[in-house]
A protein has these predicted regions:
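Basic, helix-initiating cap at the start of DNA-binding domains
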Residues: 1-36, 52-56, 61
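C-terminal peripheral helix-coil segments that are non-catalytic and often amphipathic
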Residues: 2, 93, 127-140, 159, ...
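Short hydrophobic clusters on alpha-helical segments that form packing/core surfaces
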Residues: 12-20, 66, 70, 91
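Short hydrophobic/aromatic patch on the recognition helix
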Residues: 37-48
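Hydrophobic alpha-helical connector segments
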Residues: 57, 71-100, 153-156
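Hydrophobic/aromatic residues within well-ordered alpha-helical segments
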Residues: 58, 62, 66, 84-91, ...
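Amphipathic alpha-helical packing segments from all-alpha helical-bundle domains
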Residues: 67, 113-142, 150-157
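Amphipathic alpha-helical segments used for helix-helix packing
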Residues: 95-117
Length: 196
């Protein structure tokens, strides 16, 4: 098993993540990672350790990538409404990209794979990402002063995950403009602390 302070090469990490995406945890193998990376199975085992450890490393890599891409998108916007709308568009685009699955691959998106296998960790990371954004929105007066940033962040994350998990109904999830409008029309009203 690799030591905790030893880093895994980016190409091997990418191959492990791609293998997990393609086959899912049940069919994941170190041999498949080795084939994807163009290295020996021994090299994979020396770098990633056991099959279970390799799966954990690949899941962590995918979760980190998801949270980092959301953070990048949030940093492009100043208002909470725009940040949530941009994150919703990102998740909808991710959903569209996940629709194309290899013939022998698993029939689920990366986000569903992460929620099923490391959902608690992914939710915690995502909520932690949103807390300072909600706090900043509170300081700007976009949301009510009595709103708890942690609870509001959890609400935002749960809302965002629904764009991946629920089928499109009234809003066209394939249209970034429609998704932005849908989120912008409704997101902040619930966080002002006012009653309707």
């Amino acid at each position: 098993m690799p030591s905790a302070d030893r880093s895994v090469s980016p190409s091997l990490l990418g191959a492990a993540a791609a293998t997990l995406r393609r086959y899912g945890p049940r069919q994941f193998s170190l041999t498949a990672v080795a084939e994807a990376a163009g290295v020996s199975r021994g090299t994979v085992h020396n770098s990633l350790g056991s099959r279970d450890n390799a799966i954990k490393i690949a899941l962590d890599h995918l979760a980190s990538g998801f949270v980092e891409s959301m953070a990048t998108e949030l940093d492009r916007h100043d208002r909470l409404t725009d940040q949530v709308a941009a994150a919703a568009v990102l998740i909808c685009a991710h959903r569209q990209q996940s629709d194309s699955v290899a013939a022998r691959g698993i029939n689920e998106s990366i986000l569903v794979l992460l929620l099923r296998n490391v959902g608690d960790d992914l939710m915690r990371r995502s909520i932690d990402l949103w807390k300072p954004h909600v706090g900043a929105a509170q300081q700007r007066g976009e949301v009510g002063a009595g709103i708890a940033p942690a609870r509001a962040s959890e609400w935002i994350v749960r809302l965002l995950m629904s764009f991946e998990l629920l089928p499109p109904m009234g809003v066209n999830l394939d249209s970034p403009r429609a998704v932005k409008r849908f989120v912008a029309d409704h997101i902040v009203v619930g966080l002002t602390g006012g009653q309707r």
